[in-house]
Regions:
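Alpha-helical scaffold elements lining the catalytic groove of polysaccharide deacetylases
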Residues: 104, 153-178, 192-239, 252-258
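Active-site beta->alpha N-cap acidic-glycine motif
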Residues: 54-156, 162-175, 182-183, 269
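Terminal accessory/targeting
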Residues: 1-92, 110-119, 239-275
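Divalent metal-coordination and catalytic microenvironments
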Residues: 97, 112, 145, 186-189, ...
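A short, flexible N-terminal coil/short beta segment enriched in small residues
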Residues: 42-45, 183, 190
């Protein structure tokens, strides 16, 4: 089922359109106090239920940062949405989506360990139940396990109570079965959200993490060419990048070590979202 969902919703990922402090990828919260509003919050006066099918698009600025990601950060960052990190931060935030296991995750973990970098793995309940040893490795080796919901629904299409159950159900299962581990960031299935779901997720203590880079890597039967994929990924490098890669991809697995080398050789740190 997860494979079908990925195939049906793939292109939307690319094209659709407290006190003062910083959030998980280094943005200023813009608040002077708990009750304060940022300009973005003031502009969005109601919890809109309009579904946003997010994608970073192809347009970039003079610093190679995707315009779509920057616009989304400006518009939705006040609600806990994370699309791109700070422009002055020479960091790559490396994330993987895990809906089912395709034999690649163990090798990905080996590479990350060899390169001494961490990543965030967004998992579903089915994945956690079917691959507990891999989830344990993620946690034990210092990576972040993120919440990708129990059943991978489009969050704007379900009720407030169901959104809560989708996120809290996975959170509770992971906590109960992995030594009290607490998930603190969430990636919305299919990259779909609304102001309503952003607020709900934020009220649960989560940031909603999207991305500033994603590409067509999820179809295991039609994998991208290795050389082209390497060029696509490295040429998109930018400060504060949030990379979404699918861990089912043999291509991603084959080039990951070289991609990390490229980033590090060019002065970038590679981290999980919360590191």
């Amino acid at each position: 089922m997860y494979r079908k969902i990925l195939a049906v919703t793939a292109m939307s990922m690319l094209l659709c359109g407290c006190t003062s402090g910083k959030n998980v990828v280094g943005h200023s919260t813009g608040r002077d106090d708990i009750g304060g509003q940022t300009p973005a919050e003031a502009a969005l006066l109601t919890d809109s239920t309009e579904k946003v099918c997010y994608g970073q698009g192809y347009e970039t600025d003079s610093e190679n940062r995707p315009v779509g990601a920057m616009q989304a950060q400006e518009k939705y960052g006040a609600y806990g949405g994370e699309y791109i990190g700070d422009k002055n931060d020479k960091t790559i935030y490396l994330t993987f989506d895990e809906g089912y296991e395709n034999g690649c995750t163990g090798r990905i973990l080996d590479i990350l360990k060899e390169k001494n970098v961490t990543a965030t793995f967004y998992v579903t309940l089915d994945y956690v139940k079917s691959s507990p040893d891999l989830v344990s490795r993620m946690i034990n080796e210092g990576h972040e396990v993120g919440n990708h919901t129990c059943t991978h629904p489009s969050l704007p299409d379900i009720s407030d109570d169901m959104v809560f159950e989708e996120i809290h159900g996975l959170e509770s299962y992971i906590s109960d079965n992995f030594g009290g581990y607490k998930t603190v960031t969430m990636r919305p299935p299919r990259g779909e959200f609304s102001v309503r779901t952003l607020r709900l997720v934020k009220n649960m203590g989560y940031d909603t993490v999207l991305w500033s880079f994603a590409y067509n890597d999820w179809n295991v039967d039609d994998q991208p060419d290795i050389k082209k994929a390497y060029e696509r990924i490295t040429s998109a490098t930018h400060n504060g990048a949030i990379y979404l890669l699918h861990a089912v991809s043999e291509t991603n697995t084959a080039i990951l070590a070289d991609v990390i080398d490229y980033w590090q050789d060019n002065g970038y740190s590679v981290k999980s979202i919360t590191e």
